């Protein structure tokens, strides 16, 4: 029998990737992690809400509480024929670990766990507490995942001091970028009402597309704010428009428009909603609109977590990391409102959600070292 020569982090990453945990499935990933965390002295709580599996694991009862946050679910693989290797059969080719979830984010989960095991072995009497908040519903509707766990913790007044989310934050090399905040996200589902009719008799109909076009143009041209030193200006984007029956001789009776704001801390969701409604009303539209609040903006400024992260990355990689707030949303948006400082640090994100997703094996080793150094910087003072 050949001996497994994989490093601890590579071996665990392979084990996690081999489990087909497409949202909201977990497929035993959390149990695998829980068994090892229990051996390291963690108290394990499984929190299952509807179709979602969550894990809250904690070692220690004192503050401050350092929490690794992440997800075991992955996005669907897409066209299997375009994968060079089977997506759930992890393999290393030229120092790259291939498989769905390698970068987003089973590689990070493996690095978190191995770093924690090493840290506890060195410092069994560390300060404060270490926790893991892991969900199988980050890539999906995010209804029964991290947000429900946070609600549970808040209800019993269990507070997180610092949270490191393992999202793939790096762009060109490991640690070149960390996310110390995220923009808010607000979605509007607008239905503009008209009167269906024959295109040859427009006076007997009311075309909602024609009515809505000037308002949509104004919304698209609007400057919502100027941003600030931490956030770019708020962005309004139309994501989907649907109107008509598919026939060239029918004026539609309604127009459906889906749009999204990614907004800075210079505005609130309430301000954006008010301004949108004012524009729609000014154009005399008859409409219905539903709003979906996807997350508030948050920012972790200079403080213990950001400083510990910067120092760890510099020590391990030699890189002076660049804190940014760009990109999409993450589960950090559910943790930050509790008052916790939140940072995202993970592998290079070049292949996430793509076919042939992969991560450098050497980056997983460096990421493990970074996570361990962050623990030392915060809990060994």
UniProtKB/Swiss-Prot annotation:
This is Succinyl-diaminopimelate desuccinylase. Belongs to the peptidase M20A family. DapE subfamily. The lineage of its organism: Bacteria, Pseudomonadati, Pseudomonadota, Gammaproteobacteria, Alteromonadales. GO terms for molecular function: acetylornithine deacetylase activity; cobalt ion binding; succinyl-diaminopimelate desuccinylase activity; zinc ion binding. HAMAP family: DapE. One of its GO terms (biological process) is L-arginine biosynthetic process. It comes from the Bacteria. The active site is at 73, 138 (proton acceptor). InterPro entries: ArgE/DapE_CS (IPR001261), Bact_exopeptidase_dim_dom (IPR036264), DapE_proteobac (IPR005941), Peptidase_M20 (IPR002933), Peptidase_M20_dimer (IPR011650), Peptidase_M20A (IPR050072). Its cofactor is Zn(2+); Co(2+). NCBIfam families: dapE_proteo, PRK13009.1. Binds 2 Zn(2+) or Co(2+) ions per subunit. CDD domains: M20_DapE_proteobac. Zn(2+) 2 binds at residues 104, 139, 353. Pathway: Amino-acid biosynthesis; L-lysine biosynthesis via DAP pathway; LL-2,6-diaminopimelate from (S)-tetrahydrodipicolinate (succinylase route): step 3/3. Keywords: Amino-acid biosynthesis, Cobalt, Diaminopimelate biosynthesis, Hydrolase, Lysine biosynthesis, Metal-binding, Zinc. The keyword Hydrolase applies. The gene is dapE.
């Amino acid at each position: 029998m050949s001996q497994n020569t994989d490093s601890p982090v590579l071996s665990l990453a392979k084990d996690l990737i081999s489990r087909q945990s497409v949202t909201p499935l977990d497929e035993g990933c959390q149990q695998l992690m829980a068994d090892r965390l229990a051996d390291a002295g963690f108290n394990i709580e499984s929190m299952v809400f509807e179709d979602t599996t969550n894990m809250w694991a904690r070692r220690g009862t004192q503050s401050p509480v350092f929490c690794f946050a992440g997800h075991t679910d992955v996005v669907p693989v897409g066209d299997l024929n375009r994968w060079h290797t089977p997506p759930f059969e992890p393999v290393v080719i030229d120092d790259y670990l291939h498989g769905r979830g390698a970068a987003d984010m089973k590689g990070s989960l493996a690095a978190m766990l191995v770093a924690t095991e090493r840290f506890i072995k060195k410092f069994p009497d560390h300060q404060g507490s270490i926790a893991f908040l892991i969900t199988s519903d980050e890539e999906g509707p995010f209804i029964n995942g991290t947000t429900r766990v946070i609600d549970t913790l808040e209800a019993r007044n269990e507070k997180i001091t610092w949270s490191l989310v393992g999202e793939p934050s790096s762009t060109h090399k490991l640690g070149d970028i960390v996310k110390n905040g995220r923009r808010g996200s607000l979605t509007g589902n607008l239905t503009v009402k008209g009167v269906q009719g024959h295109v040859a008799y427009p006076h007997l109909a009311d075309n909602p597309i024609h009515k809505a076009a000037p308002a949509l143009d104004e919304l698209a041209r609007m400057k919502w704010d100027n941003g600030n030193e931490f956030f770019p200006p708020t962005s309004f984007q139309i994501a989907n428009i649907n109107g008509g029956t598919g026939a060239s001789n029918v004026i539609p009776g309604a127009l459906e428009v889906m749009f999204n704001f990614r907004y800075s801390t210079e505005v609130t969701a309430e301000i954006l909603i008010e301004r949108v409604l004012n524009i729609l009303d000014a154009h005399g539209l008859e409409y219905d609109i539903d709003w979906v609040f996807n997350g508030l903006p948050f920012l972790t400024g200079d403080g213990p977590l950001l400083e510990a992260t910067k120092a760890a990355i510099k020590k391990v990689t030699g890189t002076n990391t660049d804190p940014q707030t760009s990109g999409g949303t993450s589960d950090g948006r559910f943790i930050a409102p509790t008052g916790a400082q939140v940072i995202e640090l993970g592998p290079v994100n070049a292949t996430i959600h793509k076919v042939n997703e992969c991560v450098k094996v050497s980056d997983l080793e460096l990421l493990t070292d970074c996570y361990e150094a962050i623990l030392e910087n915060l809990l060994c003072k």
